[in-house]
Amino acid sequence: MPMFIVNTNVPRSSVPEGLLSELTQQLAQATGKPAQYIAVHVVPDQLMTFSGSSDPCALCSLHSIGKIGGAQNRTYSKLLCGLLADRLRISPDRIYINYYDMNAANVGWNGSTFA
C-alpha cells in the first residue's frame, strides 16, 4: 500500500504528463510491491518556502506497510529526489521526504484493513 505524497510550489502547468504513472512504476520496482497497491498524490501550486526562498521545493511523504528503514530509505531518497529533480526541476537539496512504516491494522482498504 505504498502512498507517496508530494506537496510542491511548482505550478500545475509544469507537472509533466505521465509523472504519476512513472512514480507508480518506479516505486513498485523499488519497494517490490505491486503497482496496483501504490497511490501517488502530487499537490502542485502550494504556497511554500524552503530555506526562506520560494524557489521550487517539495515536502514529501512515503507511507508503506514494511519496506521502510535506513538503507531502503536512502535508496528511495536517491530515486525520488532524482525523479523530482529531472521531471519538476526541483533541486534535491530543496526536497524533504518523511518515511512512515505503517501498521497493517491501521491502514484501511476495500472495506477492511491490510491486517
From Swiss-Prot:
Pfam families: MIF (PF01187)
Principal EC category: isomerase
Reactions performed catalytically: 3-phenylpyruvate = enol-phenylpyruvate; L-dopachrome = 5,6-dihydroxyindole-2-carboxylate
Binding site for substrate: 33, 65, 98
Keyword Cytoplasm part of the UniProt annotation: yes
GO cellular component, one term: cytoplasm
InterPro entries in alphabetical order: Macrophage_inhib_fac, Macrophage_inhib_fac_CS, Tautomerase/MIF_sf
GO molecular function, one term: phenylpyruvate tautomerase activity
Post-translational modification N6-acetyllysine, affected residues: 78
Entry-annotated residues carrying N6-succinyllysine: 78
Cellular localisation: Secreted; Cytoplasm
Tree of life domain: Eukaryota
Enzyme Commission number(s): 5.3.2.1, 5.3.3.12
Keywords carried by this UniProt record: Acetylation, Cytokine, Cytoplasm, Immunity, Inflammatory response, Innate immunity, Isomerase, Secreted
Main localization category: secreted
GO biological process terms, semicolon-separated: inflammatory response; innate immune response
Active site: 2 (proton acceptor)
Function of the molecule: Pro-inflammatory cytokine involved in the innate immune response to bacterial pathogens. The expression of MIF at sites of inflammation suggests a role as mediator in regulating the function of macrophages in host defense. Counteracts the anti-inflammatory activity of glucocorticoids. Has phenylpyruvate tautomerase and dopachrome tautomerase activity (in vitro), but the physiological substrate is not known. It is not clear whether the tautomerase activity has any physiological relevance, and whether it is important for cytokine activity.
Protein family membership: Belongs to the MIF family.
Subunit structure: Homotrimer. Interacts with CXCR2 extracellular domain. Interacts with the CD74 extracellular domain, USO1, COPS5 and BNIPL.
Protein name: Macrophage migration inhibitory factor
